[in-house]
From Swiss-Prot:
Pathway: Cofactor biosynthesis; (R)-pantothenate biosynthesis; beta-alanine from L-aspartate: step 1/1. Its cofactor is pyruvate. Binds 1 pyruvoyl group covalently per subunit. Heterooctamer of four alpha and four beta subunits. This is Aspartate 1-decarboxylase. It catalyses: L-aspartate + H(+) = beta-alanine + CO2. GO terms for molecular function: aspartate 1-decarboxylase activity. The lineage of its organism: Bacteria, Bacillati, Bacillota, Bacilli, Bacillales.
Length: 127
């Protein structure tokens, strides 16, 4: 049996843009994608820490070193530039894979630069 597990997340990302008149998706700095092990067109969940909104979309790679986190299309109605979000990727793992899987947690600062890389999310609140 396969179960769904978090594979990686970008924690405390700051929304830089919200573009309502785009087809859809989230644009993320490609350096951040590499750090988190996320890929273009991968399905992700977005959690807005400012208003509690949760949504799903897919990734479009953004310009490297730009720090871009841009919600596009209808998702732009649920975020504002400056909002803090968590971007979570999930994967289907077998029981055996799940026992050895270590998710990547990339903690960002307010400029969307990598502040900390965590091999496994600690059992405490990250401030």
């Amino acid at each position: 049996m396969y179960r769904t597990f978090m594979t990686s997340k970008l924690h405390k990302a700051t929304v830089t843009e919200a573009n309502l008149h785009y087809v859809g998706s989230i644009t993320i700095d490609e350096d951040l994608l590499d750090a988190a092990g996320m890929m273009a067109n991968e399905k992700v969940q977005i959690v807005n820490n400012h208003n509690g909104a949760r949504l799903e979309t897919y990734i479009i790679p953004g310009e490297r070193k730009s720090g871009v986190i841009c919600l596009n299309g209808a998702a732009a109605r649920l975020v504002q530039p400056g909002d803090e979000v968590i971007i979570i990727a999930y994967g289907m793992l077998s029981e055996g894979e799940a026992k050895t899987h270590t998710p990547k947690v990339v903690v960002l600062n307010k400029e969307n630069q990598i502040e900390q890389m965590i091999g496994q999310e600690p059992a405490r609140t990250i401030l």
